[in-house]
Structures are given as C-alpha cells and as structure tokens.
Regions:
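Functionally critical loop-and-helix segments that line ligand-binding/catalytic clefts
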Residues: 193
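Cell-wall glycan-active module
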Residues: 1-4, 8-161, 166-182, 187, ...
C-alpha cells in the first residue's frame, strides 16, 4: 500500500469511527497524528490491517489515572525508610500466601530450579511482591495503558512505544483481542507481571499445554520467572547479598550504583567488610531508616539480576 494513501486512510478512519464517551480523557487515540503514524508503521513492518487497528485505537483514550501513576511523587532523601518499605511487603498476607503457594506448586518450583538453576524461594518471593501470588494482576486495559504512556508521557515514550508494538504482536500471536487484556498501569501482564517484550522473549510454556498463559497458569509463571532470571545471568548456587559493616565514608561506593564492580577485597580498602569470597564482585547497598543506624549490605551478581526483573 502506498505510504501516503495509508496515512490518509488512517486519518479518515480515525475521524469517522465512533468511540465511547470518556470526554474527560480527551479525544480517541485514533485522532492523534502520532498514533496514525504508528498504525501505518505497524502495517508496513508487521502486516497489521490499518482499518482494524484504527478501530481498536478509536475505542481508547488517554488514561489520566495511568499518567498520574507513572509520575510518583519524589521522595526526599531524608524520607527514605527501609523499615517502612520492608513492612509494606513483608506482611502476614504475603508470608502466609508464600508458604501456601510454595506447598501447592512445589513440583513446578523444583522443576524450575533444576531447569534454570533458580531456587524456589527466589521465584516465590518475586511472585509475592509482584501480584501477591496472582491476587492483584491489575485491572487496566493494557492497550489503553501502553498507548497513554507511549503517546502522552514523553520522558519514556520510546520505551512504551516499543512495548506497545510488542503487545500488539503478542496479542496477535495468541489470537486474542488487545482490548481484552488487563494488566498494571504500566502494561505489565499476568501473575509475574511481565512487560510484553519480556513475555515474548522469556516466557515459557511450563505446563506443556502448547500455550503460554501468564494470567491463569501458575506453572507457566513459575517457569517464566526462572527463565527470565537465568537469561539475565543468574548464577546457580551463588550468593545474593550479605550484611556488611562500614567504617569509612561509603558515599562514593553508594553513588557507584548497584551493579557489582569491585571485589569484596577491594571494598575493604574503603572500610567495607563482609564475610564473603574476597574475589567476588559486589556493590554496596545502603538501607536507610530515619532515626536508626543505616543498614549496609553487599549485593552480588544475583542481586543485580533480581533488580533487572524489578528495580523497585
């Protein structure tokens, strides 16, 4: 199809197709010139039908809740609190739920550990943090959420446009309408909260039913979490983190970030000491709680791999 004609077709369809009210959210996405260009690109690069895709974008609008949620209030340094953060996640609901989840899915967890080298406790902890073992997978329409962030949130527009592209491909591959899929305000999907690109690249059919279903299959979720970590460099049997004592000024080490760069032995020259392999690379992590002494840990490669899953 001629590109100029394709662009014109998108424009005509965007203006003529009906769409639901929601006037507080602005015009339908199909009326946005950037969205029209995106639709043309999806047609040219992946063979999507322009009219069909335009109808889908005509039924969604910028979601102001999503746009507010992606802009969390900045937390001043003096308000950081490891204790508050810890209490938020280490609740009796998560602990009891984790124990029950582990018992119910022990076979799959052991199989994932044998296949990918990731221990059950790490997989269980991640799923507990992400969705409380599938109880809170998000209620946002993923197409609307990703479109809102792709075209209404300039700081990360490139990232979310890429995820929107991956999401449409994912929906087509699975034979489902992109309008039917629910997830987080950032477009993460299912029990393990995979972004669309991660689902296409790392998710696995771990229950052997010839389909990957991260919303309904705990087995697929378990295997996919383990494979994600393995593919990002998980080292079987290696430590994640150990407590550290600090006698010097740790500012430079903290500022260096969480990717392991110095050996434990090299850390000692900065007044950082821990019981660990002297040659193992580490990063210094500070856990700050106002009014109490800062807690320090050395994070190793496996800790960094976990942050690749979710930095928060």
């Amino acid at each position: 199809m001629n590109k100029r004609f394709a662009t014109l077709l998108v424009g005509l369809l965007g203006g003529l197709l009906p769409h639901p009210g929601y006037s507080q959210q602005g015009p339908a996405f199909s009326q946005d010139p950037e969205v029209r260009a995106f639709i043309v690109a999806m047609h040219e690069q992946h063979g999507f039908d322009i009219a069909h895709l335009t109808r889908q974008f005509a039924s969604i609008r910028p979601n102001t809740v999503v746009l507010r949620a992606i802009r969390p209030a900045a937390v001043p340094e003096q308000q950081r609190s490891w204790q508050r953060y810890r209490e938020r996640f280490l609740t009796s609901t998560r602990v009891d739920g984790g124990r029950a989840f582990w018992q119910r899915h022990a076979v799959d967890l052991q199989r994932a550990a044998a296949t990918y080298g990731v221990p059950p406790e790490v997989i269980v902890a991640i799923i507990g943090v992400e969705t409380v073992y599938g109880q809170n997978m998000g209620s946002f329409g993923v197409l609307e959420a990703l479109a809102s962030l792709a075209f209404q949130y300039p700081p990360r527009a490139d990232f979310f446009r890429s995820e929107l592209e991956q999401f449409l491909l994912l929906a087509r591959e699975n034979g489902v309408s992109p309008l039917s899929i629910k997830g987080s305000y950032a477009g993460a999907i299912g029990i393990p909260q995979f972004m669309p690109s991660s689902q296409r690249r790392f998710a696995v059919d771990f229950d052997g039913d010839d389909r990957i279903d991260l919303r309904n299959s705990n087995s697929d979720a378990i295997g996919s979490v383990a494979r994600f970590l393995q593919q990002h460099g998980w080292q079987q049997g290696a430590p994640i983190a150990v407590p550290a004592t600090v006698t010097g000024d740790p500012a430079a080490l903290i500022a260096a970030g969480i990717k392991p760069a110095l050996s434990v032995q090299e850390m000692a020259a900065y007044g950082v000491h821990a019981v660990a392999d002297a040659e193992r690379a580490a990063a210094l992590i500070d856990l700050v709680t106002p009014g109490v002494a800062t807690e320090y840990w050395l994070g190793f490669d496996n800790f960094y791999v976990i942050t690749r899953y979710n930095r928060s």
